[in-house]
């Protein structure tokens, strides 16, 4: 997830939609005050090749306690609850969604990266690909 004050946009990251690749690409254009959330270790190493790393995703109160935390797949409502209304109302907000069939294939390979003891059509028929997965990005946007 990225909030760019420099370019006035909010990128909300959905799952299984190349969100990490988009986040890595966008991160290199971010300014020092922008919010960039952490991603996994291997992808973070790639992002740092472009000179950016996670920043400003935690805020602390005067006693040093965390009170605002932005994270990878934070929902639009959670962001809206944290940021100032003027930012929410004036920044361009976007995310990406994927063709449902392509997304199912991607999730199948994600679910079974090495051992594909269950064939794709069987995986679909036996509800391994559930409605909760089909709908799991809806709360992000």
List each language-model region with its residue ranges:
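Membrane-interface amphipathic segments in extracytoplasmic regions
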Residues: 1-141
